[in-house]
Every structure is written in structure tokens, then in C-alpha cells.
UniProtKB/Swiss-Prot annotation:
Potential calcium sensor. The keyword GTP-binding does not apply. Keywords: Calcium, Metal-binding, Repeat. This is Probable calcium-binding protein CML13. Ca(2+) binds at D22, D24, D26, K28, E33. The gene is CML13. InterPro entries: CALM/Myosin/TropC-like, EF-hand-dom_pair, EF_Hand_1_Ca_BS, EF_hand_dom. GO terms for molecular function: calcium ion binding. SUPFAM superfamilies: EF-hand.
Length: 148
């Protein structure tokens, strides 16, 4: 386990991101870069939350990686997986019905981002009730995914 409850993988990712934002190589980043850095690590702080962090942590000058780790351990809140899934499904569910077409889901999951192989998708979709209209209720799908 890494520092302050962060996993070694998280610390490694944070170090990599920190170094990318440390453009002049002095080992420090400006408080103004905190938001974009947190977002690059999966956080989604609002401007108000960032202002609050900067004020409560007295971030008035550039800070080093150890200080950054302390900040992340205290303040980085990644979106829960179920919320990420729900947000993704809502993009497909333009009418807000709670259902998405299996064909649309197949297209996206086998052709965009970290692609699933078509046979992987077929295995996945077997675990969900598909209606006679070719649609699935995505809350059921999310519940199955989160339970695994």
C-alpha cells in the first residue's frame, strides 16, 4: 500500500501525472493546475470545491509531489463506477426511458475506446434480460456489473 491509503498504482499514476504538469522540471506545480491534474486522475472537482481546497490547504505557492499526495489522499473523490456507467447509458437513452438498444450498446462497446471483442460482448449480454424489442433496462445491467 502506498501513502495515506492510496494504492501503489494510484501513487504511480499520480507521480506520472504530476511530472507531466511539472513543465519546468522544478518538482513543483502551481495551485492553478490542481483542478486539471485532479481531473486527469479521475476526479471531478467543481470550481467551488477547488477554491475551497486551495483556501483550506493554504495553497498560495507552487507545491511538491509529497504535498500533492497529501492533497489527493484527502480530496480526490473519483466518480463511483455505477455513476460512470449510468452517465454513459444516459447518453444512449436520449428519451430517458431507462432502456437502450442492444445494437447501439454493441456498436459502442466493440468499436470505441477499450474495445470488446464481439464474442466478449455476446457473453456479457447473455447475463442481462433483453426485451422482445431488442432493448435492455440499463439499471439491471449496471446492478450486474457493479455486483461482479
Amino acid at each position: 500500500m502506498g501513502k495515506d491509503g492510496l494504492s501503489d498504482d494510484q501513487v504511480s499514476s499520480m507521480k506520472e501525472a504530476f511530472m507531466l504538469f511539472d513543465t519546468d522540471g522544478d518538482g513543483k506545480i502551481a495551485p492553478s493546475e490542481l483542478g486539471i491534474l485532479m481531473r486527469s486522475l479521475g476526479g471531478n472537482p467543481t470550481q467551488a470545491q477547488l477554491k475551497s481546497i486551495i483556501a483550506s490547504e493554504n495553497l498560495s505557492s507552487p507545491f511538491d509531489f509529497n504535498r500533492f499526495l497529501d492533497l489527493m489522499a484527502k480530496h480526490l473523490k473519483t466518480e463511483p463506477f455505477d455513476r460512470q456507467l449510468r452517465d454513459a447509458f444516459k447518453v444512449l437513452d436520449k428519451e430517458g426511458t431507462g432502456f437502450v438498444a442492444v445494437a447501439d450498446l454493441r456498436h459502442i462497446l466493440t468499436s470505441i475506446g477499450e474495445k470488446l471483442e464481439p464474442n466478449e460482448f455476446d457473453e456479457w449480454i447473455k447475463e442481462v434480460d433483453v426485451g422482445s424489442d431488442g432493448k435492455i433496462r440499463y439499471e439491471d445491467f449496471i446492478a450486474r456489473m457493479v455486483a461482479k
